Each structure stands twice: as structure tokens, then as C-alpha cells.
Amino acid sequence: MHVGIFADGGYEKGMGHVVRMKRLAEGLKQRCLITFYTNQDSEAFLHEEHWQVIVKPELQQHEFILREIKSKKLDLLLFDILGAPAELLKKIKTETDAKIVLFEEKNGKSIQYSDAVINGIYGDIRSRVYVQGNTRIYEGPDYLILHPAFQAAREDYTLKKDCRNILVALGGSDPKQLIFKVLAAADQVPDIKDKNMMFVMGSASPHQEAVRRRIEKKPQYKMIEQTNDMAGLMKQADAAIVAGGISLYEAICIGVPCLVLSQVEHQTATAKTFADQGAALDLGLGELVPDETLIYQMSRIMSSYPLRLSLHKGGRPLVDGKGIIRVTAILQDLYEQEI
């Protein structure tokens, strides 16, 4: 089986798409050939000896992709991009035998030309499977692709009564620069000098040097540049401040009580859904949150063990961390239908 994976990332787009597909590729690499098609900003992040990475041209991308599918005889195509182009998918369906799987896609025109859709984030909080036309759709956290280490961390995690370690993870690129908002608020939180704060910054963030200067005289603060062990870092945390993307799901999977500052509008829906289930504290779009509100809510989650315990218990049943196993099985079954 030869799998083609299409995913882009960068400062404006964020890194969620390429992170998700890289994780999935790690789970698939022993059973198939893999070729990534990405943009210039993501090439270095995706580089790995187990697969090929090809940077798509800026012009005539659709024609290039069709040629690649035909010349490499790709069997399975995974699209994790913002708005998979229906026109291209239609041509692929007409001119090739490749199976098409879309990730986090809600556009009905695109969905009609796919064989399966995996909506781990866009789906409801309660997972389900249904058929739309000729397409099978898998929705909800059961199909969320997390690194296998999160399942192990979930089993090892114990919530402590004393909140000493706080993790801050605001996305791979933090386009709204929310980390500076959190740093300013932290200065006003009572007893913050007794807390250890870990600021995790992704490879696409341009703010690393500015953050390093900001915290250099605060020994209890630590900046972590691009980690391959987010599960290990989260397992150390007694509370977390996260964006409404993949870091939110990671924290909930392990059981880390979290405060959510969404980077973009679609993240607010996810955060609100979890908050309604008692699984997170949702403050909405981070750039719109008043400083006083952020200071108050940070103080609250750090000081109240009953609140953290309630969030811990409310979230853990919702994300079990086994999504990558389920998705890998779905892809294998889809491929074998044609054999």
C-alpha cells in the first residue's frame, strides 16, 4: 500500500494539520510506503527517514497532485488541509482508483467525493459513525489522533492537591501572541513565585527569543522549544493553560485540569463543548479576554483543588487516547476493500 498524505502548516495556518498527520504516519510506517506533500514551511518538521517529503509547487498544484497520484500509483490519499478542494477530489475520483480520506472536513461538496471522513475534532463530543451518500463519516474524540504516549501518561497520572506545576501550551505558532498575555497575567497571580511554569513553544512560533528575554530573571519559569514528549511534560502538570486545539484534547485525555484560551473562532466551539461537560474552564477567544478575567481564572484554577478535581473527573471519560489505533484500522480496512 502506498499512501499519499497532504498537509500544510506554518505561522498563519498553525501546525495542527501536519502534527496530526505526522503522528498518523508514525503509526502506519511499518505497513506501507508513505509520501508527504506539504508546503515549504512544514518540510523540515516532517522530514524523516521512513518517508519521502515533497514540497508542492505554488502554481498548478492540482495538476501536479494528479500527476503524482498517477505516476506513483498511490492507493490511499489522506487530505488534512483547510477545505479540501472539491474540484480536485472530483478529478481524482474520475481519473484514478485511489481511495480518498478527508480529515476535519465539513464541506459537503468535498465530502461527496471522498470514501471516508475522520472528524475527531469537528464531530460532537459523543462519537458516532454514519453514512452520507457513499461516504462513511467517523466523528468525535474516539477518532482523535493523539500520540500513543498520551494513553500511557493517562494511566500514570495522579492529580495532586497542591498545584505546583503549570504547563502553558498555546499552539505550535501562537498567532495571537497569547503567551505574552499569560505572562502578564501571571505577574498578578498571588503566590506565583511558588509555582513552576513551563511554556511550551512550537517550531512555527516566532516569539521564542522574546519570551526567553521576558522570563530570564524568573527561575521558576522554563521555556521549552519544540518537544517530542508533550505527554511527558503534561504528566508533570497540576494544571494547564492551553489553546482550543490539539493541546486541549491532550490535557483532557491525561486528566490535567485546564483553562482554555482559544486562538481562532472554530476552537471556541470545541472549548465550549468541553466546558459544558465540566471538563475545562473556557474563556473564549484569548485575544478578547480581559486581563482581570484571566488573572482571576488563573488564580482560581491554581488555588482550588475541588475545582481541579472536578475538571479532572469531568474530562477523562471523554477522550481515551486510542483514536490512532481506530483510525489506522479504518484506513487498513478501506484499502483492503479493493484487494
From Swiss-Prot:
Domain of life: Bacteria
Broad class of where this protein is predominantly found: membrane
InterPro entries named in the record: Glyco_trans_28_C
Membrane-spanning segments: 241-261
Pathway involvement of the protein, from the record: Spore coat biogenesis; spore coat polysaccharide biosynthesis
Gene3D superfamilies cross-referenced by the UniProt entry: 3.40.50.11190, Glycogen Phosphorylase B (3.40.50.2000)
GO terms for MF: glycosyltransferase activity; hexosyltransferase activity
Subcellular location as annotated: Cell membrane
Record keywords: Cell membrane, Membrane, Transmembrane, Transmembrane helix
GO cellular component: plasma membrane
Family the entry assigns: To M.jannaschii MJ1062.
Protein's recorded name: Spore coat polysaccharide biosynthesis protein SpsG
Source organism per UniProt: Bacillus subtilis (strain 168)
